[in-house]
Structure formats: structure tokens, C-alpha cells
């Protein structure tokens, strides 16, 4: 009897581990909502809203330029995501205005007595007519932060078990640096999601290549999409994730190393198509993406010193020091699952973009938390597991308290 193919799909389970992870992500989103509810619209918000809306509603509105902000040469996906909720909300309100009395219409400016729109309404004109503009601007980035947290938990739980997953996710959800990146329109949280997801998807593809070919395709499609997010967040993120991922794939796929290069090349080529779509199939506008200064990279200890010297990150700092001591002193902690994220963190933390604004140290943070989760999980399974669990719980509580204490500073 032939089995229906949908019956072979792994069933999603929402048991206690998933509920705990969902609770932590809920606390993460609650902190983001609290910050957002107390913020005010800034010039940066207006720029992302204006340019993002133009990409959806009227690209090329200014002759010779992709948007009135000029030709976006880096981070086009952030503009797209910032403008999408506003454009959708405006479209919905215009639809409802058809059934409203003229004096009750939400979108008042630029409409004739017959309801025809004469011109595109600016974000400044809409600031009092569309509710929750500030929240709509931040929803995509809060969503990206929650998705990165879910991916972090999924990776660490599969590698290290429940304790490793809880440790990494708790430190992530109470990280002021991550919250700060999620409560303002910017490409950094998107790049962090792409770099972390891309490298671990590369490792997943390499493992799948040991099995039948039918398991390759969905992972390669996912890898292509993640590479697309990388190149449209920061151009430099694509070669970084491709090269690091390629190195790990060659490490893992011992018997199929000859097929690793075509897989990475296909995913990278597909990401360029994704970027072309984000630029509205405008080759001229996309040409500004490939500028030399977009891929200039330098190295300095300043980003790491600034992060670890912050009092709000004291819990992560102490956890990092403890994890490094255990990694160097305990043989069982030195294996691929712990070494890979440590190498990524050591490479990305001192990296600095010199041609464009960027924060590669933020891209390194999920790898650092993965490393901490793995080493702590090993310690909790050792001979002094009770002491290790008590120490880990104390550090998580410390980081949570410091994060909540620092929330007003993120406004």
C-alpha cells in the first residue's frame, strides 16, 4: 500500500520544551513592545518609512534614482520590510474608506469627492491618520529577532539538548544589544539572522549530502533564500557566510566534498536573483550594490571590548569567561559542535565595516550564545551537575535582571 507523501512530514510537537521556548520568546517580544510603546518617531524612522513605501508603491519616483533617498547601495531589504506594513495598512484603510462617510475616512488627504486618489500621501501626512505607525515600522524587525531566537533554540537544542537550548535562548532573549537592534529600522538583525542561519544551514546541507538526494533539495532552497537575505542586508554578509559555510561543509561532507562547491555556487547565484527582485528588477539600481566600499572589512578589538565592558552584558561576559575556561580545561567540551560557533564568534567579533555602517559584532552574538549553551550543557551533564546547573541558573537570572534594568536606556 502506497503511503501518502504528506503523512511522511514530521509532526510538529508543542510539548514542555517548546512551551518554555515560546514563553522566553514571548518575554523577548514583550520587552520589545514595551520599548516601542515609549519611543517617538525619529528622522531615521521617517527615512525608512518613506523610502520603503516608495519601493512598494512608486519605485523610480525621482528621475534617475530608485527612491527619493537616492540609490540604496546596501541594506535594501530593511527598507522593503519597514515600508511593507505601512503600504499594506494604507491599502486596507483605503479599501475601508469606500464604505465610510467622507468625514469619517481615515485617508483624507489627496482624495477627490469621488474617492479617487490624486497623489501618493507622504508618511508625514499619514502620521496622525494611520494608527500605530511606529509599531508597524518595527514589527518586521521584532519578527526577525524572534525568528533568530527560534532558530538559535532549534540549533542548540538539537546539538546540546534542552539545557543547552534554554541557556542560549534565555541569554538571547535578555540581551540589550539584540533588543536595541530590533526596536529601530536597520539591517543588522536581518544580517545576524542570515549569517547565523546561513552557516548552520550549510552544515545541515553537508549532513544531508551523506544521505539520499531527495533530502538535499529543500535544504538547498532554504540556503538560497538565506543567502538572499544576507546579500540584501549587507553585501559583505554574503561572502562571509558563503566562505565560512563552505569551510564547515568541507569539514563535514567528507565523502562528497566535490559536490560542495556547486551547491554553494547555486545558492549564491540564487541570492543574486533574490536581490534583483528586491530592487524591482532594476539593473541600474542594483548596480549600486556592488561597490568596492560595501565589502571593505577591518579588524579591531574595540567592538568586543565595548560589548563585554558594558554592565548590561555582565551576565553574558561572566558566562563567556566560564565557558572558555571549561572549553580549555575539559576535553569532552572540545568537539565540532562547540568549536564551530567559537570560531565564528572569534572571527566576527573583531570585524568592522569601513565602507558602510554595520555591526558584525552583533552577527557574532548568536554564535557566542551557542558556544555558551553547548559548554554549559556539557558541564551540567558532568560529575558536578548540580553545581553547574546552579551556576548557570544564577548567571541567567543575573542577565535577566540587568537587561530589564537597562530597558529605559534603550528608548
Report the location of each language-model feature:
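Short helix- or helix-capping micro-motifs
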Residues: 26-28, 168-173, 200, 227-231
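Short acidic/glycine- and proline-prone juxtamembrane loop motifs at membrane-interface regions
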Residues: 42-43, 177-191, 357-361
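Interfacial juxtamembrane loops and adjacent helix segments
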Residues: 57-140
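Hydrophobic, aromatic-rich transmembrane alpha-helices
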Residues: 147, 152, 249-252, 313-342, ...
Amino acid at each position: 500500500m502506497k503511503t501518502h507523501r504528506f503523512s511522511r512530514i514530521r509532526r510538529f510537537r508543542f510539548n514542555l520544551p517548546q512551551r518554555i521556548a515560546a514563553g522566553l520568546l514571548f518575554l523577548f517580544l514583550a520587552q520589545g513592545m514595551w520599548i516601542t510603546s515609549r519611543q517617538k518617531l525619529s528622522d531615521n524612522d521617517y527615512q525608512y518609512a518613506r523610502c520603503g513605501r516608495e519601493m512598494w508603491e512608486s519605485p523610480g519616483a525621482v528621475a534617475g534614482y530608485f527612491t527619493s533617498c537616492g540609490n540604496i547601495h546596501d541594506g535594501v531589504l530593511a527598507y522593503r520590510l519597514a515600508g511593507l506594513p505601512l503600504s499594506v495598512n494604507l491599502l486596507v484603510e483605503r479599501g475601508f474608506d469606500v464604505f465610510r462617510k467622507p468625514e469619517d475616512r481615515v485617508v483624507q488627504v489627496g482624495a477627490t469627492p469621488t474617492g479617487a486618489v490624486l497623489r501618493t500621501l507622504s508618511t508625514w501626512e499619514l502620521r496622525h491618520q494611520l494608527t500605530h505607525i511606529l509599531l508597524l515600522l518595527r514589527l518586521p524587525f521584532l519578527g526577525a529577532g524572534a525568528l533568530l531566537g527560534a532558530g538559535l533554540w532549534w540549533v542548540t537544542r538539537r546539538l546540546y539538548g534542552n539545557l543547552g537550548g534554554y541557556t542560549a535562548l534565555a541569554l538571547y532573549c535578555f540581551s540589550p544589544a539584540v533588543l536595541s537592534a530590533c526596536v529601530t529600522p536597520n539591517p543588522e538583525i536581518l544580517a545576524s539572522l542570515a549569517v547565523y542561519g546561513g552557516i548552520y544551514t550549510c552544515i545541515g546541507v553537508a549532513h544531508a549530502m551523506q544521505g539520499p538526494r531527495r533530502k538535499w533539495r529543500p535544504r538547498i532552497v532554504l540556503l538560497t533564500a538565506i543567502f538572499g537575505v544576507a546579500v540584501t542586508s549587507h553585501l559583505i554578509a554574503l561572502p562571509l557566510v558563503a566562505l565560512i559555510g563552505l569551510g564547515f561543509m568541507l569539514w563535514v561532507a567528507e565523502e562528497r566534498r566535490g559536490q560542495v562547491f556547486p551547491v554553494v555556487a547555486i545558492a549564491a547565484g540564487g541570492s543574486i536573483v533574490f536581490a534583483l527582485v528586491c530592487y524591482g528588477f532594476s539593473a541600474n539600481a542594483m548596480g549600486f550594490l556592488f561597490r568596492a566600499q560595501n565589502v571593505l572589512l577591518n579588524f579591531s578589538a574595540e567592538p568586543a571590548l565595548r560589548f563585554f565592558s558594558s554592565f548590561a552584558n555582565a551576565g553574558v561576559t561572566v558566562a563567556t569567561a566560564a565557558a572558555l575556561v571549561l572549553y580549555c580545561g575539559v576535553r569532552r567540551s572540545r568537539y565540532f559542535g562547540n568549536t564551530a560557533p567559537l570560531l565564528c564568534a572569534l572571527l566576527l567579533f573583531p570585524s568592522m565595516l569601513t565602507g558602510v555602517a554595520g555591526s558584525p559584532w552583533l552577527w557574532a552574538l548568536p554564535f557566542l550564545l551557542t558556544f555558551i549553551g553547548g559548554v554549559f550543557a556539557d558541564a551540567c551533564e558532568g560529575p558536578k551537575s548540580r553545581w553547574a546547573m546552579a551556576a548557570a541558573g544564577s548567571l541567567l537570572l543575573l542577565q535577566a535582571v540587568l537587561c530589564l534594568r537597562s530597558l529605559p536606556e534603550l528608548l
